[in-house]
Amino acid sequence: LNWKELAPEVHHFEFEVPGVEHFSFTPGQFISVVEPVDGKEILRPYSIASPRSGNRFSLCLNHVPDGLVSTYLFDLKPGDEVKIHEPLGYFTLRHPARRAVFIATGTGIAPFRSMLLDHVPRTKPPITLLFGVRCEEGLLYRAEFEKLAAEYPSFRFLPTITRPNPSWTGLTGRVQSHIDDALALCAPDEISNVDVYVCGLKEMVDDVRKELKSRGFTRKQIIYEKYN
């Protein structure tokens, strides 16, 4: 175990799985962290935030003051061992050959970091990431996404902030108000060839799904995962 702070109360945790050469998962999946409490096991799912890389993987999570497992993880020290359950989940890139739009808020960025760092260097179809946070310091992994966009023309990074500083010159407001910006490179007759992936809190996910359906997206084109 190792970790670093990404933003206030948000940490990036790095883990090494002993005894295996490759930790097998599909980008976008989650693992469950196990905390022993009074002889019982408390499980909490967390999306893997890293691409496939040997026997290592990463998590990105915020500290919930009353959260048992997040507090447990935030109290760990480098080198401590953690029990996990194997990767699961279907929030993965369904059609790598199709154009994709990713929409995330907060730590909902975790599965998208895993997908982007894994897929963008290897694939040509355009991918746009619309990432919404409250303030500029909450733009988790910002430097990585900006570097990725600079290196690969097929990737666009659109951060938006609801409480911007006066110096901020990018998009402002919620992601719900910038769906058309994310779809800007798609002609109306190309909508049927675009998949949209959404990850974040329930209210945002539900709002974005409604907006997408009103623009002609079908249920199969909208892949989502809700965080509590």
Give the ranges of each region predicted by the language model:
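A short, basic/flexible loop-to-alpha-helix module at the beginning of a structural domain
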Residues: 84-96
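Short, conserved phosphate/pyrophosphate- and ester-handling motifs at nucleotide-, phospho-/glycolipid
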Residues: 28, 108, 201
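Reductase modules of NAD(P)H-dependent flavoproteins
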Residues: 126, 130-228
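Ferredoxin-reductase
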Residues: 1-78, 134, 160-163
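Short, compositionally biased
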Residues: 45-55, 94-106, 215
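Histidine-anchored nucleotide/phosphate-binding helix
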Residues: 109-120
